[in-house]
Amino acid sequence: MTALKNDRFLRALLKQPVDVTPVWMMRQAGRYLPEYRASRAKAGDFMSLCMNPQFACEVTLQPLDRYPLDAAILFSDILTIPDAMGLGLYFETGEGPRFKKVISTPADIEALPVPDPQKDLGYVMDAVSTIRRELNGRVPLIGFSGSPWTLATYMVEGGSSKDFRKTKAMAYDNPQALHLLLDKLAQSVTSYLNGQILAGAQAVQIFDTWGGNLSAAAYQEFSLAYMRKIVSGLIREHEGRKVPVILFTKNGGLWLESIAEAGADALGLDWTCEIGDARRRVGDKVALQGNMDPTVLYAKPEAIRKEVARILASYGHGTGHVFNLGHGITPEVDPEHAGAFINAVHELSAQYHQ
């Protein structure tokens, strides 16, 4: 494979020296970009965009052609695994993701297969290898998956949920059934991420979008335990380089110490944490990624720059910080504001790496 021309993202995750703080954005290939909207219209719908490696590659590279980002992230969806388990993923306009089949009994869970990354999710592996080839060493490629808990909520609720009542009822009424489901999902996520690494992903992130909705005890039992299991089963070195692992639990700021013990190289932070405080708590163990409130991008470029400066100052000197938003960039953001954000990170962070 081609040597990396810009490896500061990987270096920061491994707490090695960098010249400036690296930056990328969750959902950087997304609806805020007119070129993404054009590609999506051409593909027909969101799933066709995900399932066609050429389209997935095209939209992954769009933000990199526009901005000096330090990483690319595979364009896909966290729900590819449940779809490959036979649940029938589809998208309702205005409703988000739905499943044709819902998991409600132990028998449903027993019947679920563990997908084979090559056979059942080959389109994702093809997308990874295509993107990696097209990147030609420009920046590293991030692979990703949803966490077992987050995937389980969609599978049991049948789609998005405000209160996760069915999944939480299962956690308390029938924990053995939920553990069986989470165990199958942990196996599936491990092989899925390892497949992505072998196909060319140079770092991986686990998105635990709904872990922060659990109580502290339930988070340990139903979310963190399974992420720890995945991390211990991942390929950590490939092509002569370490493959860093990032864990991101949205609203998980109260539990950073426990998450930092899970074996990952870095923790993602949402915007409710103060990054300087997070560094004092766990910065000796892990790198940190984040954590500007995505809605700051609706403000004027000068205000965006000011908030970037504040977060950089809060983190302080030295490596171990990858700048990102605290969650995905939203569709209505002006692309110029995203550009102002990225430029501000590079321009204002150099002083912290001298």
From Swiss-Prot:
Keywords: Cytoplasm, Decarboxylase, Lyase, Porphyrin biosynthesis
UniProt key word Cytoplasm: yes
Record pathway: Porphyrin-containing compound metabolism; protoporphyrin-IX biosynthesis; coproporphyrinogen-III from 5-aminolevulinate: step 4/4
Keyword ATP-binding part of the UniProt annotation: no
Positions that bind substrate: 27-31, 46, 77, 154, 209, 327
One example GO MF annotation: uroporphyrinogen decarboxylase activity
Gene3D superfamilies: 3.20.20.210
Predominant location: cytoplasm
EC number(s) recorded for this UniProt protein: 4.1.1.37
Matching InterPro entries: UROD/MetE-like_sf (IPR038071), Uroporphyrinogen_deCO2ase_HemE (IPR006361), Uroporphyrinogen_deCOase (IPR000257)
Catalytic reaction annotation: uroporphyrinogen III + 4 H(+) = coproporphyrinogen III + 4 CO2
Gene Ontology CC entries for this record: cytosol
GO BP terms: protoporphyrinogen IX biosynthetic process from glutamate
Class of this enzyme: lyase
Site (Transition state stabilizer): 77
SUPFAM superfamilies assigned: UROD/MetE-like
Cited CDD domains: URO-D (cd00717)
Subcellular location: Cytoplasm
Assembly description: Homodimer.
Family: Belongs to the uroporphyrinogen decarboxylase family.
Protein name: Uroporphyrinogen decarboxylase
Organism in which the protein naturally occurs: Pseudomonas putida (strain ATCC 47054 / DSM 6125 / CFBP 8728 / NCIMB 11950 / KT2440)
